């Protein structure tokens, strides 16, 4: 992996970690955020490219909404929700879709800043490998984030001690 990609990955992971921590403080009862954050920490330990691939897998099909700050990205409209259910989305995976309508303008702008910053870093990562988009789509379309976490929970893949350690 070349040095510039390594820097993008490090910055992406640092920014996503910061964003997730802020969102968990803002929405302490949203279990989806905590689950996403736990999965982020585990996957980052295994391979630091996985978090950016998961994020981009949940955002690629919504690039226009992200770039234009289109609130449909956070909407719960039936057509949007049906579209998300095929491959999932970052806002659904984290539960942010449930809070969007009740947030202040300042909070919405701060969230957009993070979402767009992470997306730009994701594009920088993808643009270095022409086959990366296809790889991300193949993985993301085969199993959604929620299905992955459900499988892990149902099969007791992680010990309670391990879960407690990564949730610290």
Language-model segments: what does each one mean?
Residues 146-168:
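Alpha-helical oligomerization segments
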Residues 1-136, 140-149, 153:
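Terminal low-complexity "docking" segments
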């Amino acid at each position: 992996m070349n040095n510039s990609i390594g820097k993008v990955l490090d910055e992406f992971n640092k920014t996503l970690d910061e964003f997730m921590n802020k969102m968990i403080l803002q929405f302490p009862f949203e279990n989806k955020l905590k689950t996403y954050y736990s999965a982020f920490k585990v996957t980052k330990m295994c391979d630091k490219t996985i978090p950016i691939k998961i994020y981009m897998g949940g955002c690629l099909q919504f690039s226009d909404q992200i770039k234009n700050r289109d609130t449909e990205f956070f909407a719960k409209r039936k057509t949007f929700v049906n579209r998300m259910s095929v491959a999932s989305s970052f806002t659904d995976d984290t539960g942010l879709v449930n809070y969007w309508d009740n947030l202040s303008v300042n909070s919405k702008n701060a969230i957009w800043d993070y979402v767009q910053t992470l997306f730009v870093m994701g594009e920088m990562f993808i643009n270095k490998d022409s086959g990366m988009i296809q790889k991300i789509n193949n993985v993301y379309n085969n199993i959604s984030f929620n299905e992955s976490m459900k499988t892990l929970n149902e099969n007791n893949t992680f010990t309670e001690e391990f879960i407690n350690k990564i949730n610290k």
